[in-house]
Amino acid sequence: MVSAPLLGWAAIRPIPVSRLKTCKYASNSLQSYNGIVASYLRLHYYRSLSSSAVLAEAIVHLEKTRNIGIIAHIDAGKTTTTERMLYYSGFTRRIGDVDDGSTVTDFLPAERARGITIQSAAITFHWPPLTGDGTSSSPSLEDLEAQNLPRSRASHTVNLIDTPGHADFTFEVLRSLRILDGAVCILDGVAGVEAQTEKVWHQASVYQIPRIVYVNKLDRDGAAFGRTVREVGSRLQGWPAVCQIPWFEGSNGRFTGIADVVSLQGLLWKEGGDGKSVKVFDLNGLENEDKSLAEELKRARVALVELLSEHDEDMVESFFEHEEDHLTVPSITILKSLRKCLLGPETQKIIPVFAGSSFRNMGVQPLLDAVNNLLPGPSESHDPEISLGSDKTSLGNLLSGELALQQDPKTASIEKSKQKKKAVVTRTSVDIKSLTANLESCALAFKVVSDAKRGVLVYVRVYSGSLNRNCHLYNTNLHVTERAPRLFKMYANDAVEVDSIPAGHIGVVVGLKYARTGDTLISCTGSKSVPPEPLNTLQLRPIDVPPPVFFASIEPHSLSEEKNMQEALALLLREDPSLHVTIDEDSGQTLLSGMGELHLEIARDRLVNDFKAKASMGRIEIGYRECVLDQSNPVTKIFDREVAGRKGKAGCTAVVEPYGQELESDGNDTSGSDDIIFTETVDGNKIIISAPGVNITTDKKGKEESTSLPPQLDLNSFRTSLYNGALSALARGPQFAFPMHNTKVTLTCNAAEHLFGSESSASALSAAARLATQGALRNLTTTAASTGTGMMEPVMNVIISVDEASLGAVVHDISSARGGHIVSLDEEMPISTSLSQSPESQDQPVAVDINKIYAPPDPFETPSVAGGLPIQAPANQPRTITAKVPLKEMVGYLKHLRSLSAGRGTFVMHVDRFERMSAQRQKAVLAELNR
């Protein structure tokens, strides 16, 4: 046994208990570990650290900061791994357990009752842990670089987000991914790469987040690390770089440790311990301890160096410098090469793979080292995208002064034909710097939580500057200014008040009344109101909200409870924008829409138990859509009435027609007309605004303006009013009262015919657009039944995992009884037939030859698969079915699937598209809905 120079955690002592005993409440807490006292102790400890100069220094140095998330399929071990990370970092004094409901990050009652993660939890800790007195001898990264030591020897601040795995909480994962710099993807060593894992993996690719893979649960019967590695290559579309291989011991293949391919060391954990006692063997010691493992470790090192050499020229040079000996290439060189490949422009061509068993307390510390060594800090992550008015750029370009404000792409074709319209206006560096000199901070609100004690907590990621206490934050989405009276750093459900949140960090603002998920918040020095133009339009890339597919009615127990219920719903919608609330005009019922049955059940529990709303929820139903079948005649409406005591008058002409990508590609798109000033696709509908006679020019600052509009109506509010009017009309179909889908609306507002001077207010214009669009929709239904509207239903992309014995019964049930269409049926589902075609995944797949992937042999397998030799599949090999099935047929499907598969089948699904229903099916659905 030897010391481990690459394992910084092995030489650092945990925080001493004496540190906690300074608290007067701590006398009996270490024996009974009462939950309240434990929470207080953690809070007391971090408050004491926050005052130290060391922590302040750690906050400033972004290169020692990691904003990471844990992503995975449900039950892969995300929360269990998080609890071990907190324990080894010294944040907790005992290991929380999901089954006991004692975890730190799953603190909601519903999470502890169901044993699943519902809400993403943010928590901050240090790895390796700081010493007990709040001072640290942690070396600088420059010193480590000079000594050829890894980054993991220096203590890093880790901001960790534990995300849900259930498909119903996809939005919770999406808004967490939006603010991460890196991620750890956890795989179940028995189940391998599962369907939800693929979906989350490709969602992370959209945000270009570097990821490492941790294969968990290797202690369980049936665990197959080698098979999982091959699935990483075939289903996650990247070359797996095996950085660790599992150490199986004894005749029954008992998992006892790992062999580190980078450092050529063996790590052996004490069975039944808390994971802090580790024996470390060098290669010579490992040959004496387990010769077969040592030989496999050498093969793994050869494969790793060869793989990196194909993607990194520096690794090739190092290989030749060390006499072409794979085993003598320095460990630090391999770490640098892995990091270079992971953070390079072609993100995730190489996927580092690690091994462990979090529940058995094995492999978590090396995983934390990998987070420090491989994943990027905030200063190394991709420059966030922003919009500034109608221009798209990056925040880095704005702050550096290298910014050219370009014309709006939506009106590019118009400008070509109208040479006198808006030209490209380029600001000089001096102009931009003068604008941004007073920009104090820029942050994204990625989550809103209602806390019973602290009020509304707005979680923010600061992208530039420093967000200071009592600063005035301007919301560029809502155009309101609010003061930030209190700032917190969150440790799951515990909070520490701070004076500022620096760039690159995650924190909480308390006291904001209006901020929502996805809003951009900026502050400027010396400004208490609106920032100067165009900074007041600066918006970070928003968080896309997926469309809801289920809905249920919400009714208060009495009329006196109506107000309380609406207030609770408003809080719930600020927390979770993937929920939608609408009012049925016919029945007057309040309808709550969401992503799935479990999603709505949790929302109901939150309303009743957390917000104390005295209300009940009706039966969960499916959200259908309505579509037009033909083009309507032009319908013109003039709105002429008083609004809030002021006369309003405006007009608009609307035409509605079917819309779809296939129709656009056939040349039916009319968006190239010279008079079109706005085009937007939203919720499957397309809205086009044409404004004949509205002459648009651009001033020296790049701002669009028009002298043809009334003085009280600027160009932006002119567009927005018409757009909102059309949106309002599309929210309810004329025949079945479902929201419209696959509908194109063309609005025409002629300056000479439809505008009436000072009487044409924004509200009057919006009302005219709504009336005209509604009239065009009704025009179709009154002409003829064949040219009216039809119904559309959500069709789901369903991925079912069953064993071989149940395959036939499940396929027959899907294709016959449920009217589904089988897309693929294979042991390893091709990525091209599953999630790569979903709107979330826009990354280009990497061509991976599975036969060239190195994977160590699994227990009880005779051939080594180091050279990619095939292994005969077991008789009851898990099979994957991919199908397209109407959502109506999938309601309550889990119980039926379990009866068909003897309780072993699982499935996940997401909305693939909305599809037109046949006349017979539409009639049956309407009869069921009593319409």
From Swiss-Prot:
GO terms for biological process: mitochondrial translation; ribosome disassembly. GTP binds at residues 72-79, 162-166, 216-219. GO terms for cellular component: mitochondrion. Belongs to the TRAFAC class translation factor GTPase superfamily. Classic translation factor GTPase family. EF-G/EF-2 subfamily. Pfam families: EF-G_D2, EFG_C, EFG_III, GTP_EFTU. PANTHER family: RIBOSOME-RELEASING FACTOR 2, MITOCHONDRIAL, TRANSLATION ELONGATION FACTOR G-RELATED. This protein may be expected to contain an N-terminal transit peptide but none has been predicted. One of its GO terms (molecular function) is GTP binding. Mitochondrial GTPase that mediates the disassembly of ribosomes from messenger RNA at the termination of mitochondrial protein biosynthesis. Not involved in the GTP-dependent ribosomal translocation step during translation elongation. It is found in: Mitochondrion. Residues 63-379 form the tr-type G domain. Keywords: GTP-binding, Mitochondrion, Nucleotide-binding, Protein biosynthesis. InterPro entries: EF-G-like_DII, EFG2, EFG_II, EFG_III, EFG_III/V, EFG_V, EFG_V-like, G_TR_CS. Gene3D superfamilies: 3.30.230.10, 3.30.70.240, Elongation Factor G (Translational Gtpase), domain 3 (3.30.70.870), P-loop containing nucleotide triphosphate hydrolases (3.40.50.300), Translation factors (2.40.30.10). The keyword GTP-binding applies. This is Ribosome-releasing factor 2, mitochondrial.
